[in-house]
A protein has these predicted regions:
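Membrane-anchoring hydrophobic helices of lipid-metabolizing enzymes
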Residues: 1-117, 150-155
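Catalytic core of membrane glycerolipid acyltransferases/transacylases, capturing the structured
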Residues: 111-165
Length: 165
């Protein structure tokens, strides 16, 4: 039964990826944000997000923050099919790098460093940009629970984000 569920999920996600590829980056990103805000709480535990916000001593409107968290995940999901365009600089206007001089120093001195990122905006782009700067990079990736989707995502990550996963 789990295999059927994974296959159905795979077909649905592949369909969405096809739509996102056809409608372009900006539309995909905006629709992904809307879908994430709308559907995210159905597929993920909204209460665990709120509990984590409380543990982190985040103040504010938990409902709004949670809604934006799900929206952000939806946006990242929808942008996956456009990673190739980030890699080949067709979407570089959406990326800003603060502290590029540190990357230049790391490359020049061949220092070994560890970069830490959170799930802020499209967090996948960090490893891509580090690798594009000519720095030998490896990324840690938790495999998806769906083996069909994981195979596709791993291929996309290796091709467009960072060769070493």
């Amino acid at each position: 039964m789990k295999s059927f569920y994974h296959l159905t999920q795979f077909v649905f996600i592949t369909f969405l990826f096809t739509i996102f590829r056809l409608i372009g980056f900006k539309n995909s990103s905006n629709i992904g944000f809307f879908l994430g805000k709308t559907l995210g709480p159905i597929f993920r535990s909204k209460s665990s997000v709120i509990q984590n916000l409380k543990k982190a001593n985040i103040n504010g409107d938990f409902e709004k923050i949670t809604s934006n968290v799900f929206g952000n995940y939806g946006r990242i999901f929808a942008e996956y099919v456009h990673l190739k365009n980030f890699k080949n600089d067709k979407l570089s206007k959406y990326i800003s790098i603060e502290g590029k001089e540190y990357l230049d120093q790391i490359k020049k001195n061949k220092k070994k460093v560890i970069f830490v990122s959170g799930h802020f905006n499209n967090f996948e782009l960090m490893a891509m940009q580090i690798e594009k700067q000519g720095i030998n990079c490896a990324a840690i990736y938790r495999p998806l629970n769906n083996p069909y989707l994981n195979k596709v995502m791993e291929k996309m990550r290796k091709r467009h984000i960072c060769k070493k996963q």
